[in-house]
Amino acid sequence: MSLVHINILMAFIMSLTGLLMYRSHLMSALLCLEGMMLSLFVLATLTILNSHFTLANMMPIILLVFAACEAAIGLALLVMISNTYGTDYVQNLNLLQC
């Protein structure tokens, strides 16, 4: 395993740790999720380039599409919570149930 792969895995682990530690605010949780998705994208791209597996060239692009959709939904939820309650605490998500 090369040093680049180890650094990317460490970035993923740091983002996961940040998600587990700072989960009280929705904005920090969304930032940690974006860090995880970015490290997964770079790791998938490097793995496909190193293995020369041409059939999976679209996988990083599909991962980016899902990351963009996740970010859009997360930001819409953040705006809705902050407009309704004035804060971005994750505990307010339980109050949005119908």
Swiss-Prot record:
It catalyses: a ubiquinone + NADH + 5 H(+)(in) = a ubiquinol + NAD(+) + 4 H(+)(out). InterPro entries: NADH_UbQ_OxRdtase_chain4L/K, NUOK/Mnh_C1-like. Core subunit of respiratory chain NADH dehydrogenase (Complex I) which is composed of 45 different subunits. GO terms for cellular component: mitochondrial inner membrane; respiratory chain complex I. It is found in: Mitochondrion inner membrane. Keywords: Electron transport, Membrane, Mitochondrion, Mitochondrion inner membrane, NAD, Respiratory chain, Translocase, Transmembrane, Transmembrane helix, Transport, Ubiquinone. The gene is MT-ND4L. The chain crosses the membrane at residues 1-21, 29-49, 61-81. Pfam families: Oxidored_q2. One of its GO terms (biological process) is ATP synthesis coupled electron transport. Its EC number is 7.1.1.2. One of its GO terms (molecular function) is NADH dehydrogenase (ubiquinone) activity. Belongs to the complex I subunit 4L family. The keyword Nucleotide-binding does not apply. This is NADH-ubiquinone oxidoreductase chain 4L. The keyword NAD applies. It is a multi-pass membrane protein. Core subunit of the mitochondrial membrane respiratory chain NADH dehydrogenase (Complex I) which catalyzes electron transfer from NADH through the respiratory chain, using ubiquinone as an electron acceptor. Part of the enzyme membrane arm which is embedded in the lipid bilayer and involved in proton translocation.
